């Protein structure tokens, strides 16, 4: 699982600037989940070959008793509890503040590695910057400038050394014996535990409410139709003997970790409840991560035909961006519709891992252009010459040509649909990248 780094500090010390630096902004997965993450952002970053998740908390007032500051403090505490590393940010220009001391008092008790970071330290002597903050009792302060990037790489590399050292590594044998990795995600009480029970069969899954979430990664191996699968813990499963207990408490961090670790995600929805923003945000995580996806609409049994039609219309309207995914109407409790659901899991995995030969891709591209050319931009019409595969899970198709920056989003979607149809890429996001050739004689007289 990707380690989680929580950025904590009083207001206006530069947490958001550091968050943007660590995630390179464009990689941010989602911001401000309504009703769930007031002033808390979740993003993904990478240092070399080591990925990580970052949580940007709101300004922390640990002694706030009520109102919005109290809510922000509660959200921050949850972020800290779900993290592997805490980066505590203070302001080098304004020096030590009483709030810093209150936050330090709280952090010393949480049992997480703490990295004390003095931001806005550009142009200042280290001894002057650090002097005030030693009294916090959190070790040597690390001086950085989030705005300019000074010291940030060294700090994050050091934090990741600690984070990855605390994670048990799977052996090569364990990795090879794993089947298709499936994450079942959804908001609480949509029936994740019931579906897990129906899939795993002989194991018992008990759902109950409990504050906090387990930090341990759990993989449950099972077979279905002679095929091996591995279920990733998404409901907060905890093994007790042969019993799996599911903590039905929604955690953004656990959901993000599970999605990024999976080969295929099953997004489970409740047919008896309206599609919520939270459902749409979880779906957005999946698309951003490029994961293969199957949607299960649970509790379909016994629904009035009019309710079924209304639910289908609601799905089509609110989850239109999931048009690449198969939707299945199931009952986990009655074990109906699960066979077709799992066949779509297999199809989505095959599509995500498909190998697309360059000659066939280029032929499909040429056919698409002959059927419908891209529009001109002024006197220039983009020329699409050839295509090759740039990656898997999700499939990436790289198209080469001239003036490709003039390609419209509408034409890009047209090409995506043509490639999907030609190569039967159902159930997986598809990325298309354009690379324009440069004219070597353009600057010569």
From Swiss-Prot:
Keyword Methyltransferase appears in the UniProt entry: no
Cleavable signal peptide: none
Positions with a binding annotation for GTP 1: 9-16, 56-60, 119-122
Keywords: GTP-binding, Nucleotide-binding, Repeat, Ribosome biogenesis
Binding site for GTP 2: 186-193, 233-237, 298-301
Residues covered by the EngA-type G domain: 3-167, 180-353
Function comment: GTPase that plays an essential role in the late steps of ribosome biogenesis.
Assembly and interaction partners: Associates with the 50S ribosomal subunit.
Protein name: GTPase Der
Organism listed in the record: Paraburkholderia phytofirmans (strain DSM 17436 / LMG 22146 / PsJN)
């Amino acid at each position: 699982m990707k380690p989680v780094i929580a950025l904590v500090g009083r207001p206006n010390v530069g947490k958001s600037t550091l968050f943007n630096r660590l995630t390179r902004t464009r990689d941010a997965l989602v911001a401000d989940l309504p009703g769930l993450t007031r002033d808390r952002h979740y993003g993904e970053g990478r240092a070399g070959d080591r990925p990580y998740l970052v949580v940007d908390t709101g300004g922390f007032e640990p002694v706030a008793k009520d109102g919005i500051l109290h809510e922000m403090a509660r959200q921050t505490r949850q972020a800290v509890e779900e993290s592997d590393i805490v980066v505590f940010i203070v302001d080098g220009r304004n020096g030590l503040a009483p709030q810093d001391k209150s936050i330090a008092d709280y952090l010393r008790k949480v049992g997480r590695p703490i990295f004390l970071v003095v931001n806005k330290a550009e142009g200042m002597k280290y001894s002057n910057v650090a002097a005030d903050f030693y009294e916090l009792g959190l070790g040597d302060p690390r001086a950085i400038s989030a705005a300019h990037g000074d010291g940030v790489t060294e700090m994050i590399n050091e934090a990741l050394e600690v984070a990855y050292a605390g994670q048990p590594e799977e052996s090569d044998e364990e990795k090879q014996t794993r089947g298709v990795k499936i994450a079942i995600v959804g908001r609480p009480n949509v029936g994740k535990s019931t579906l897990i029970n129906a899939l795993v069969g002989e194991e018992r899954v008990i759902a109950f409410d409990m504050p906090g979430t387990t930090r341990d990664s759990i993989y449950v191996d099972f077979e279905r139709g002679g095929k091996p699968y591995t279920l990733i813990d998404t409901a907060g499963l905890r093994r007790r003997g042969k019993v799996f207990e599911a903590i039905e408490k929604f955690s953004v961090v656990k959901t993000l970790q599970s999605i990024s670790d999976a080969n295929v995600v099953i997004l489970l929805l409740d047919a008896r409840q309206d599609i919520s923003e939270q459902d749409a945000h979880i779906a957005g995580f999946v698309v951003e991560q490029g994961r293969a996806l199957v949607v299960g609409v649970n509790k379909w049994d016994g629904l009035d035909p009019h309710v079924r039609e209304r639910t289908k219309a609601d799905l089509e309207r609110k989850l239109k961006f999931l048009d690449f995914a198969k939707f299945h109407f199931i009952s986990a409790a009655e074990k109906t519709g699960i066979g077709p659901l799992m066949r779509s899991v297999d199809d989505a995995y095959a599509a995500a891992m498909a190998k697309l030969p360059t000659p066939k891709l280029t032929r499909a591209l040429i056919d698409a252009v002959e059927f419908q050319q891209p529009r001109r931009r002024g006197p220039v019409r983009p020329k699409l010459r050839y295509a090759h595969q740039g990656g898997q899970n999700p499939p990436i198709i790289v198209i080469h040509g001239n003036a490709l920056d003039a390609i419209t989003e509408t034409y890009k979607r047209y090409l995506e649909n043509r490639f999907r149809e030609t190569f039967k890429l159902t159930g997986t996001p598809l990325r298309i990248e354009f690379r324009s050739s440069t004219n070597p004689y353009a600057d010569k007289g």
